[in-house]
């Protein structure tokens, strides 16, 4: 993973203010706009869908707003900036429609207005901007017009994302996710509640043909640590460093962790449920990790082995789940094979990698000739957020597949959708005739979501065949 500051919110993209015609970060806006209804889940429209949107405008002033306003609907896109994977440039494209609308809003009052569009033919991202003249311009929403995917149930889809909500994943045709969960002790008072919530979520995944790689993390174990606190590294004087902390639980909890993993595999493992693989920790680097790993490779091997034992026991009861991880081939060699033996190979079904590009470990004879469960070690990209623009994501996916990846990711979800359940506001307050009411927030979907939909339709589950331009691109 990377520091949150590296990922850029849409309002920080190059050209956002100019293309949208809005001003970011003002202390006061005369009016606000909220999308309160959309005729497509996650604001992703397919060719057969009617495009209908309903907005609520709120007057933030003590004066009436009575104006002939304009609703601008226009197509835009994003493109990459050389040597920068995190900062997109927004560009305006060839469609724009202006809808006149008269708005009359009482002081500190509100009004609802609907917008319908029936002449969009090109795939991509579309912005809806309200222009109220002297009262300013505000973004109403961003939606995408995307290719409709052909979804079928499968165990190992070739494209994956992090969890962005079932609606969004379904609409862009992505059927596999990395899903991080904490280790919750089976003896804790909230374990059954945790299981029930997970059961609801896993059913949602299963019903929508979305497979899951569970990534077990640090859990809720601070109270079990010495002095009941997590542990950062020390400097040469024995003082705590202001850095990441060690969140690894103590060895006496390993058997409970094994029980935890086994119960989840039995409950939610394939084919009974959507879980097709498990791994341990996000980027568990040696020394320190953004995700709180500061134990040594011996400790990792101990915990990983318990996770693998749980999976093997679940397999004996008909569950088909892979076990793997590492997040880079060099880290996997450290964690699993540093003793010079292949003793861990039978419980190393897949390697997860992050940000390795063409440096794909597909030529290791020991991994390719593996005869244990499901054969050779699979190569899964479970992060690599590098193709974060319309013009890059398809190329990144194609390049990764050509490098021998069995699964690609290639993009951070926030560049496609602002509704990540773990990073976004769930509810908003709207005005009604009966007073204020909380409703689910409808989030903006950005142009790169349409590029992902196109990649899924045009690349999808196809096997890599050959490089067309073996001596480099012809231009």
Protein language model features and the residues they cover:
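Mature N-terminal, pre-catalytic/accessory segment of carbohydrate-active enzymes
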Residues: 1-174, 182
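Sec-exported extracytoplasmic/periplasmic mature domains
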Residues: 170, 182, 206-210, 266-270, ...
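Aromatic- and carboxylate-lined catalytic core of secreted/periplasmic carbohydrate-active enzymes
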Residues: 398-475
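Active-site cleft segment of glycoside hydrolase catalytic domains centered on the general acid/base Glu
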Residues: 227-350, 354-371, 390-398
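Acidic-and-aromatic substrate-binding clefts and catalytic sites of carbohydrate-active enzymes
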Residues: 160-167, 181-197, 221-224, 285-288, ...
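N-terminal substrate-binding region of glycoside hydrolase catalytic domains
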Residues: 137-263, 275, 279
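Structural preference for beta-strand elements that scaffold enzyme active sites
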Residues: 158-160, 176-178, 209-213, 275-279, ...
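Substrate-binding surface in catalytic domains of secreted glycosidases
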Residues: 355-397, 405, 414-423, 438, ...
């Amino acid at each position: 993973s990377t520091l949150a500051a590296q990922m850029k919110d849409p309002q920080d993209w190059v050209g956002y203010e100019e293309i949208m015609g809005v001003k970011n970060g003002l202390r006061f806006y005369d009016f606000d706009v909220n999308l309160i209804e959309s005729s497509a889940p996650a604001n992703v429209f397919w060719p057969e869908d009617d495009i209908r949107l309903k907005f609520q405008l709120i007057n933030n002033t003590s004066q009436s707003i009575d104006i002939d306003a304009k609703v601008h609907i226009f197509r835009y896109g994003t493109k990459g900036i050389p040597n920068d994977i995190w900062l997109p440039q927004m560009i305006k494209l060839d469609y724009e429609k202006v809808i006149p609308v008269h708005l009359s809003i009482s002081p500190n009052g509100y009004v609802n207005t609907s917008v319908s569009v029936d002449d969009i033919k090109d795939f991509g991202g579309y912005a809806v901007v309200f222009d109220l003249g002297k009262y300013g311009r505000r973004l109403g929403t961003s939606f995408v017009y995307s290719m409709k995917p052909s979804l079928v149930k499968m165990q190992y889809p070739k494209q994956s994302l992090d969890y962005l909500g079932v609606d969004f994943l379904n609409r862009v045709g992505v059927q596999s996710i990395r899903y991080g969960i904490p280790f919750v002790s089976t003896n804790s008072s909230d374990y059954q509640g945790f299981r029930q919530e997970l059961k609801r979520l896993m059913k949602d995944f299963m019903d929508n043909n979305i497979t899951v790689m569970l990534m077990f993390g640090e859990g809720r174990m601070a109270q079990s640590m010495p002095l009941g606190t997590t542990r950062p590294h020390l400097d040469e004087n024995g003082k705590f460093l202001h850095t990441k902390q060690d969140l690894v639980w103590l060895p006496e909890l390993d058997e409970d962790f094994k029980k935890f993993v086994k119960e989840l595999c039995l409950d939610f493992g394939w084919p009974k449920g959507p879980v097709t693989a498990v791994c341990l920790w996000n980027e568990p680097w040696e020394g320190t990790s953004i995700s709180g790993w500061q134990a040594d490779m011996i400790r990792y091997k101990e915990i990983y082995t318990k996770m693998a034992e749980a999976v093997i026991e679940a397999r004996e009861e008909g569950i088909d789940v892979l076990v793997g991880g590492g997040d880079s081939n060099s880290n996997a060699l450290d964690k699993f094979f540093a003793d010079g033996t292949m003793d861990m190979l039978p419980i190393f079904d897949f390697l997860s990698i992050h940000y390795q590009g063409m440096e794909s470990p597909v030529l290791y004879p020991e991994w390719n000739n593996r005869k244990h469960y499901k054969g050779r070690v699979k190569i899964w990209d479970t992060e690599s957020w590098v193709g974060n623009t319309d013009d890059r994501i398809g190329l990144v996916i194609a390049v990764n597949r050509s490098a021998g990846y069995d699964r690609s990711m290639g993009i951070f979800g926030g560049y496609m959708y602002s509704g990540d359940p773990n990073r976004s506001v769930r509810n908003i307050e709207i005005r009604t005739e009966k007073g204020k009411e909380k409703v689910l927030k409808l989030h903006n979907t950005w142009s790169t979501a349409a590029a992902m939909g196109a990649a899924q339709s045009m690349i999808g589950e196809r096997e890599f065949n050959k490089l067309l331009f073996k001596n480099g691109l012809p231009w």
